[in-house]
Amino acid sequence: MLHFIGDSAKRINWQSYCDNGVTRVKEVSTILGAMGIAQKMGMELDDKALVTLVCSDKGDTYGIPANENVIEWSIDSRQVGTEDFVILYDLDVAPRWQIPKTSGTTIACLKARNLHLLKNMTLKDAKKPELIPVISMNDLRTNGASISKAISWERTAIDFLRDLHYGISREILDRYPFFVVLLEADGLIVRQQDTLTLYFIPSKAEGDSGSLENEELRNSVCTEIIRQIVSGKYDFTRVLPDTLSMQVLPCYEELEAPESWSILNEKYGRDRLEIIETAKRIVIHGEKEILNSVPSCKYGALQTVDRMEIESYRAIVNLMKKYAQDKDTRPLSLAVFGFPGSGKSFGIKQIAKTLGGFEIFVYNLSQFTSLRELEVAFQEIRDASIKGERLPLVFFDEFDSSFNGEPLGWLKTFLAPMQDGVFMEDGRERQIGRAVFVFAGGTSTSFQNFISQDQNLFRKAKGPDFVSRLKGYLNIQGPNPTSKEDKVYIIRRAMLLRSLIIRNAKQLLDSDMRVNIDENILYALLTTETYRHGSRSLEFFISMSPLLGEKKWSSSLLPPRSQMDIHVDAEEFMSKITILAMCKELAKISHEMYLEAELAKTPNKDLQAVTHWENLNETYKKSNIAQMQYHVERFNDFCIGIRQKSPNSEKFTFKDEDLLKLAMAEHERWCKERIADGWVYGEKRDNEKKIHPSLVPWEQLSEEEKQKDIDVILRIITLFDRIGLELYYK
């Protein structure tokens, strides 16, 4: 049974409607609070169990009238059974003394002023929770929690985990095995026993769908949460109207790098082969799969799923919005960094296009030879600012280039314009006016790279003074890996590749927007190590390939190697083209070697896999090919390359630690494959029932079983030798 106590309110609005061409208005009332939830859930109210505090109903106001000071919730606890739920709803109309205790489970929807009540509760050690708090993250912030908002879902989640360990959230929530924290109407964090789960709308930030200050919205969200709890379904993906994704949050103390933890990495960054398969689907079928599961942001034609880029873009957007609305007469100064061709100006321009009201100016400082040219640029900006039709958005490309032979020589010339909004013209000080300055790095690939230059040189060039005047910066990740730990660059590359194909080679798309591309070319485009000129090099492959009139991008339509080598390592790229075929050949040879060894041990061995490759079940063929491809991709993580065998080269030997890690990875791969195919653990192997005794963690394997995985890795050396290739440490 459900019991409802707490605040209720009637909100009266006037709604216009058309009656035979005549506009009329009618009174529409909405019941909020405890009674509103009971009404939404279709409950027949028991007056003895429901205490309703009637509120003002004037106009569109709600809340206890100021002259009433109701400080207690009351309920006859004798009416509440151990299996009952008490729904307590707080409209924050008055401070309270306590939360009533019952023998059932209380779901307490509390607001900021009464969160302190959660600190004083004494709980029994029972399997069924006595009290389930349902509160908002905003109210935790009001009570002093240091938790960011609307920067990224990851940042908010990690800040909350930190506060739950060390901050006010620990005092308020840590004792409760079950609680719900609302992230406006765009997400929620749920704790159930030892598991914390983030539910979120991938394409939005906290607050995009509306504020919980709107009590009608809060009532609707809380009603669905209560419905999921009392029904025992706990399907919190149904709480909000938009599609919700979910991510189990890590234990904060076990996080090695909280600032770089990302949902994209958690979902797709664990296994390189899985990343590649996901990237292939993005290029061929579109981004829907990934956009429905990981955080993203979109401004015009710009779309990203990279946490660092999302946080930077949103911070820049907030700065530009605020500047557009305020009255500051000095320019807003921003900086953007990235590898050549990473799209530094593209992102900012798309943001400006989305926000509207900007006029774009571009100046390349590396092409300026005198201060006079910069003065002319400032005058053009000043004229546009005085005109006032649109706000000047000014790109100073390669601002970190040398001037008059002095490294970073341009920096000091911008100090006065950035600080005071003035420049010198013919010896006179002139006002620049309102503008947004965007300094795009030419030699510095990141902000950290820019400020970590030779410090004597940096100070001499007034670098610290320049940095102190910046209001924000943006690091563009681009299509190349930014570090050894960057595993999901292939996802970024796939999204860029699809957008470039749609823009420059529409004929490759069928009626379902499916890209027709040879799997070998796609694999090479996604996995080649580096594009020498970033996204421009990727675009080159499309523009220089003879695709006009072609419906499919096949290997015969690639650019000449001489042109290709300008943008990638052509030899490496072409070797990638053959990897899939190579893996099939390696899988075939591997199976025949395995067959030969097994039959030598037991000539009449009765196993499904003991048959020649041509007669082998397709499931086993795919498994063997996937195994080869998996290890070829894993070699990248260990700086192991593949090349044509040389007559004078020494025999390759794995480092001991690499051999162990690769063997452990092979066992993990095999377990995942078997589990996905429906196999389960059992002490005795049974192929028909799909039972296998080796479906256990590596540490629980016998030495004999471990050696089998080690032998799989060692056999790879022989396999490559048979096809005229060899492994080597790069």
Task: Give residue spans per PLM region.
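Alpha-helical propensity feature that highlights long, continuous alpha-helices across diverse contexts
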Residues: D569-K730
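Conserved catalytic/switch belt of AAA+ P-loop NTPases
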Residues: L408-R434, G442
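The conserved phosphate-sensing helix
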Residues: E529-P546
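Extended, charged/polar low-complexity intrinsically disordered regions
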Residues: M1-D326, F541-I577
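A short helix-turn-beta junction within AAA+ P-loop NTPase domains corresponding to the substrate/partner-engaging
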Residues: F358, G433, F447-N480
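Walker A/P-loop nucleotide-binding motif
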Residues: D328-F346
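Short glycine-rich substrate-engagement loop in P-loop NTPases that contacts/grips substrate
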Residues: E359-E389
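Hydrophobic positions on the alpha1 helix immediately C-terminal to the Walker A/P-loop
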Residues: G347, I351
